[in-house]
Amino acid sequence: MAEEVWVGTWRPHRPRGPIMALYSSPGPKYLIPPTTGFVKQTPTKLRAPAYSFRGAPMLLAENCSPGPRYSVNPKILRTGKDLGPAYSILGRYHTKTTLTPGPGDYFPEKSTKHVFDSAPSHSISARTKTFRVDSTPGPAAYMLPMVMGPHTIGKVSQPSFSIKGRSKLGSFSDDLHKTPGPAAYRQTDVQVTKFKAPQYTMAARVEPPGDKTLKPGPGAHSPEKVTMTRPCAPVVSFGIKHSDYMTPLVVDVD
């Protein structure tokens, strides 16, 4: 074996671990489920009752009432506080002084016109601004309807005539060379009013259907390689070496 030529970097050596393909039965990878305990127990056996041990419960405190932090007022009863009237002393309120008119604010000499008869008095004031911004339309703001023409309103209108320009057709200045000639009119087809003659169309030559696929020629065949009708020597083919660790494929043909 030392004289053989090795291909690649692989060299024969002992396996570093167990190869599972070498074992014909389930190896240590498949463990039988245990019959004791609670986790992963075998389903084929009856399971006995399991008990668990727990620590001792904590003892409650002897005094469960609130401590001295909560001092209940002895004057508070179930109906409320049992207290006498209590008063508090506050400062004086600030009173707001009202401004009243004094003796100099009155004019008794002007009260004679309210008690005795007095002559009428007039006052001259400036002109008001309401006349300047008056939006009432003036005489020139109205547009009276027309009394002449065909569009009168509330009046009977007379007949109106319009004068039109002279027509260029048939006048002395009409150019007769621009009139259409006999060739400008389309002649009516006779077959529209008369019997229509039969019409024929000539089509291209019709080829019969055939096979246009490419066929092999004489040079495409190799009669010397035919071994079905002639005896030939046995032929051997080289295959690959199958591994001893590969499971063969078994197909159920039934």
From Swiss-Prot:
InterPro entries: CIMAP, SHIPPO-rpt. Residues 207-226 are annotated as: Disordered. It comes from the Eukaryota. One of its GO terms (biological process) is cell differentiation. It holds the Pfam family SHIPPO-rpt. STPGR repeats lie at residues 180-205, 216-241. Its main location: cytoplasm. GO terms for cellular component: cytoplasm; cytoskeleton; outer dense fiber. Keywords: Cell projection, Cilium, Cytoplasm, Cytoskeleton, Developmental protein, Differentiation, Flagellum, Repeat, Spermatogenesis. The keyword Cytoplasm applies. It is found in: Cytoplasm; Cytoplasm, Cytoskeleton, Flagellum axoneme. Belongs to the CIMAP family. Microtubule inner protein component of sperm flagellar doublet microtubules. 'Shippo' is a Japanese word for tail. Outer dense fibers are filamentous structures located on the outside of the axoneme in the midpiece and principal piece of the mammalian sperm tail. May help to maintain the passive elastic structures and elastic recoil of the sperm tail. This is Ciliary microtubule associated protein 1A.
